Design a protein with these regions (language model features):
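N-proximal low-complexity "stem/linker" segments adjacent to membrane-targeting elements
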Residues: 1-28
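C-terminal beta-rich recognition modules with glycine/proline-rich loops and embedded aromatic residues
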Residues: 196, 260, 326-334, 339-431, ...
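Well-ordered alpha-helical scaffold segments within catalytic/enzyme domains
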Residues: 64-79, 128-143, 176-188, 239-254, ...
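Solvent-exposed loop and edge beta-strand segments that line ligand/cofactor-binding
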Residues: 46-62, 112-126, 143, 159-173, ...
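Beta-strand-rich binding/interaction modules
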Residues: 437-458
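Low-complexity, Ser/Thr/Pro/Gly-enriched N-terminal "stalk/linker" regions
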Residues: 29-61, 80, 86-106
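Hydrophobic core segments within long, regular secondary-structure runs in both alpha-
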Residues: 66, 82-96, 128-131, 147-158, ...
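Aromatic-lined, polymer-binding surfaces characteristic
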Residues: 98-101, 122-139, 146-185, 233, ...
């Protein structure tokens, strides 16, 4: 059953086990070590010491870390962490000017450059993350101080910028639009939503003398509703599209609605990696052409995978269609989880789908440090993605051990308790306990990869058809203590790309549940992972991981290797080289690549005997 407009409502953060999140991560210590916090402290000192350090957008890194910490407080109260956030709030706001302006780069000798570099200056980008941190802290603790500081900056913008005769304004890096929509939801002040509409209007292109290439790269500077495809900087384009989807959710604007749906189709059908990653080209961190999805050269920035998930989440709420949740899940368990090591101390800026051992992808620090705190705020906020409510009932989008205590649209309190082996095992039980007997619908997402799903309610198999890639609508009178059992199909399968993806033509990847797998040298020391093929006639055997991969499921299968190194063969021959030597192969989840140290790895392999 499809719902054209579900009017879903967010539920609060819920108790969810997120194994990849490490509360003891030292990211704040690294931000301190590299001067990010001192950049604020110095502005409250007469001598302006120490000198400012880092790129012009480092303010946002601290704001993102604060948002992550704020969301974690909602699930796990921590007095020490809350006191640290209060301290940082005071440090930040001590640097705010009486006008409301707040930025640690455009000060002193650079103050004259304010708003003169709107294409690349990141002033509004940093403000967006300040607002999101303030909103998160307010929702978690009720404290408004940081939020009010962000609002003062927005009020400054409203006074100074807008259509002529005011000064022109542009989001050179979209992000503020999302924050303004959330600020409107938090305060009810429609002026903030109208400011987002002004930014989407693109009316200032002439006054700002924008070049066509900048308009494409920024995904800003022309009317958003004229966009026909995702192009330019991947994170910018997806953040802009997410903000536009937020605008649709709050206004119902039909032209914006058609635009965001069109852009998502371009993304999902032509420009997203099998891992949920986005951004084919390192040059400019940009999208490529349709079906341009290289593997070793893939940029696939961690922030872009996060942005893609955010965009899909908004459209899930707009439409109630499971395809958006499917893409969210693909990104989360693959292209997002790969961005952080399992111990939470190493990060990926880019996430290629193949790389040699000498490609240093995971690092503790980057000069551009947008991804680490973005990953942290994503993981600490995950509980908000698992459930939604609507007039009809409750929606379950993802399955992890979680508890929801919330209320139906009627006001009746209810609890859901999910106990599951997911994402590794398919057995799932959902306890449904309304405070009083009530009729409503429980919408269960059936992932597209689960081709044969069994569902029972109180021991009786449901009669409704259970289709992959949709929501199963269980409408009934629910009573306290009702139990829903779901068995998802965890059969490992080969995945094939659209033939237009030239780099993956004749190749296959492996998937089990939500996880995409890769072949890594650590587990296949006697095989050149770049010169081996899958055997389409061989079985795919799930096996339990050990050591650093304890708790994970690996895949074992048979492959076919060449008799000798391909480097010793002629460049051109009259007969094709054929792999014939049988070898055992072990695949690990993609998110774990280089987690045990650098090693050759690849996701896509040539597939012999792989007729569909």
């Amino acid at each position: 059953m499809q719902y054209n407009h579900t009017a879903m409502a967010d539920t609060p953060l819920v108790s969810v086990i997120v194994p990849i999140y490490n509360e003891e991560s030292t990211l704040l210590e690294l931000l301190e070590e590299h001067g990010v916090v001192d950049n604020f402290r110095r502005l409250a000192r007469a001598d302006r010491q120490p000198p400012r350090r880092g790129p012009l957008y480092t303010d946002s890194d601290l704001y993102k870390w604060m948002e992550a910490a704020a969301w974690s407080l909602q699930v796990r109260p921590d007095a020490k962490l809350e006191a640290k956030l209060d301290e940082l709030t005071d440090v930040i706001l001590a640097a705010q000017e009486p006008s409301g302006y707040l930025n640690t780069w455009f000060v002193d000798e650079r103050a004259a450059l304010r708003w003169q570099q709107q294409v690349s200056g990141h002033e509004l980008y940093c403000l967006g993350h300040l607002l999101q941190a303030g909103i998160a802290y307010y929702r978690s603790t009720g404290k408004r101080k940081l939020l009010d500081g962000g609002i003062r900056f927005v009020e400054y913008l409203l006074r100074e910028f807008g259509p002529a005769p005011k000064r022109p304004l542009l989001t050179g890096h979209p992000e503020l639009e999302l924050a303004l929509a959330e600020l409107y939801r938090t305060t009810g002040d429609r002026r903030y939503l109208e400011l987002a509409a002004y930014l989407f209007s693109g009316v200032e292109r002439e006054r700002l003398k924008l070049r066509e290439r900048d308009v494409a790269y920024m995904f800003s500077g022309k009317p958003f509703t004229e966009r026909r495809q995702l192009e330019g900087h991947a994170v910018r384009a997806l953040y802009a599209s997410t903000g536009a989807a937020d605008y649709v959710l709050e206004t119902g604007d039909e032209v914006f609605r058609r635009t965001v749906l069109r852009l998502w189709e371009d993304f999902a059908l032509r420009k997203v990696y099998v891992t949920g990653g986005a951004g084919a080209r390192a040059a400019g961190e940009t999208f490529g052409e349709a079906y341009e999805l290289p593997n070793r050269q893939a940029y696939s920035e961690s922030c872009a995978a996060i942005a893609g998930m955010l965009f899909s989440q908004r459209l899930l709420h707009l439409t109630g269609e499971a395809k958006y949740a499917d893409l969210m899940e693909r990104a989360l368990y693959n292209g997002i989880c790969s961005g952080m090591s399992s111990d939470g101390t190493l990060y990926c800026y880019r996430n290629p789908l193949a790389a040699p051992a000498n490609d240093r992808i995971r690092n503790p620090w980057y000069d551009t440090t947008c991804c680490p705190p973005n990953l942290q705020r994503t993981f600490t906020a995950l509980g908000a993605y698992f459930f939604s409510t609507s007039r009809e009932g409750v929606w379950v989008h993802f399955y992890e051990n979680a508890e929801l205590k919330w209320r139906l649209e009627s006001g009746t309190g209810m609890e859901l308790a999910v106990k599951t082996g997911m994402p590794w095992q398919g057995e799932t039980e959902i306890g449904v306990s309304p405070q009083k007997q009530e009729e409503f619908t429980l919408f269960l997402r059936i992932p597209a990869w689960s081709l044969a799903t069994r569902v029972e309610v109180n021991g009786q198999r449901v009669r409704e058809p259970v289709r992959p890639g949709g929501y199963l609508a269980l409408r009934r009178v629910w009573n306290k203590g009702d139990r829903v059992r779901v068995e998802f199909d965890m059969t490992p399968r080969r995945v094939f790309a659209n033939p237009r993806v030239s780099e993956d033509h004749g190749k296959a990847a492996l998937q089990r549940g939500p996880f995409i797998y890769c072949l890594e040298k650590h587990d296949n020391p006697d095989v050149d992972v770049f010169e081996v093929s899958l055997n389409g006639r061989a079985g795919l055997e799930p096996v339990r991981g050990s050591g650093a991969l304890s708790g994970a499921i690996l895949l074992r299968t048979e492959g076919l290797a060449y008799d000798g190194p391909l480097s010793e063969r002629p460049l051109y021959e009259f007969q094709p080289a054929a792999p014939r030597r049988r070898v055992r192969l072990v695949f690990v989840p993609y998110y774990a690549f280089h987690d045990r140290g650098p090693a050759d790895f690849t996701v896509w392999l040539p597939c012999v005997n792989c007729g569909r």
